[in-house]
Amino acid sequence: MYIGIDLGTSGVKVILLNEQGEVVAAQTEKLTVSRPHPLWSEQDPEQWWQATDRAMKALGDQHSLQDVKALGIAGQMHGATLLDAQQRVLRPAILWNDGRCAQECTLLEARVPQSRVITGNLMMPGFTAPKLLWVQRHEPEIFRQIDKVLLPKDYLRLRMTGEFASDMSDAAGTMWLDVAKRDWSDVMLQACDLSRDQMPALYEGSEITGALLPEVAKAWGMATVPVVAGGGDNAAGAVGVGMVDANQAMLSLGTSGVYFAVSEGFLSKPESAVHSFCHALPQRWHLMSVMLSAASCLDWAAKLTGLSNVPALIAAAQQADESAEPVWFLPYLSGERTPHNNPQAKGVFFGLTHQHGPNELARAVLEGVGYALADGMDVVHACGIKPQSVTLIGGGARSEYWRQMLADISGQQLDYRTGGDVGPALGAARLAQIAANPEKSLIELLPQLPLEQSHLPDAQRYAAYQPRRETFRRLYQQLLPLMA
């Protein structure tokens, strides 16, 4: 048996995995986010630990944990958890979706002109390094007391094992890691007036970083089992769905849309707002494009058009008048990350006439989200990734009609697989399983999810969509000056 813990933003999820790789028990505990000022997003690390402790005890009530061999941790990335020399938390953790430090991003890139080469990424307010610069500038008395900086899941590890440790995939999201070398960058740390001594030790995702402290093991009804490094949420989620080898790729359609592709070497294209991070598996990296509003656009449009829900919206789109002039939708309801890196980007309908009604608007929304997802996929492929097929997961991927439309727009074979909703906790448990079974291959331990349906792009429809995609791109560029 193996345990996977996923420290999310809205809750902690813990799962129990058997030797066959099946989830036999799961528990979730809710978390809340504090927003004391505009753009701020914070959580109390003590809340993380209390929720994890409750979830683990509930899991133990559901199923004996005596046979657990190892435990893995995944979690929300980028959060800045600041500790003093007595391991006390100095202030609430500043989360990945906190937007206060845009100025510090500009300042850091000016201080280290080669930062994009070292980190493989554009400096963004979500990342950890600019948050520390903000603390130094606005809370100097707190900054002076910092002994260690930990990422959210690694604070849980400290409470479980007493060890200061992190994994490569999560560390890559700090902007302090030399992503190609898989080591801390002294240049990036010095730019924030920090040193290696204030950073956790680095491990690969399936390496053991320590063991459960006796008092924690006793409280959870377990042995003092090894704890593995684990991974950031996206990398751990990818491990869970079997994204192991170079050129394997997955498209996750949730509130946001994430396109994740594995590479065997370090590739980057920071100017396109593609994230380039280490994978949670050794000698592997990954590229990731992020669309901020994917399935959330469908929820919004269903309400806007008076349709009861997303399935009704998709049914309406299928009834759209084929002879009507096309309508375009720019799906930037929360700004956009890849490829525009523009928090000021806005949503737009364009091309409306008296011919158009709710059905045509519904179709435009599905197509517009598809065009934006394809833009994100294209910039990842431009880095040198060549997937044969793309695994499609997430709640937004349930519609067969929309899945086929996405294949036709992108020109990619899309393989819809079920079971991806377990999320990063599954990847964390599988990383623990790898550590406990060194004699077994990754292919054996990390199978792909069951295939439900493959969607091949229709050549005719693909050809018809390309000029519309070009208009979609031109629309954004033409409207850009008005979006500031």
UniProtKB/Swiss-Prot annotation:
The keyword Ribosomal protein does not apply. Transmembrane segments: none annotated. One of its GO terms (molecular function) is 1-deoxy-D-xylulose kinase activity. Substrate binds at residues 77-78. The record marks 6 as: Important for activity. It holds the Pfam family FGGY_C. Sugar binding is accompanied by a dramatic hinge-bending movement that enhances interactions with Mg-ATP. PROSITE patterns: FGGY_KINASES_1 (PS00933), FGGY_KINASES_2 (PS00445). Its EC number is 2.7.1.17, 2.7.1.-. The keyword Nucleotide-binding applies. GO terms for biological process: D-xylose catabolic process; xylulose catabolic process. Homodimer. Belongs to the FGGY kinase family. Catalyzes the phosphorylation of D-xylulose to D-xylulose 5-phosphate. Also catalyzes the phosphorylation of 1-deoxy-D-xylulose to 1-deoxy-D-xylulose 5-phosphate, with lower efficiency. Can also use D-ribulose, xylitol and D-arabitol, but D-xylulose is preferred over the other substrates. Has a weak substrate-independent Mg-ATP-hydrolyzing activity. This is Xylulose kinase. It comes from Escherichia coli (strain K12). The lineage of its organism: Bacteria, Pseudomonadati, Pseudomonadota, Gammaproteobacteria, Enterobacterales. The gene is xylB.
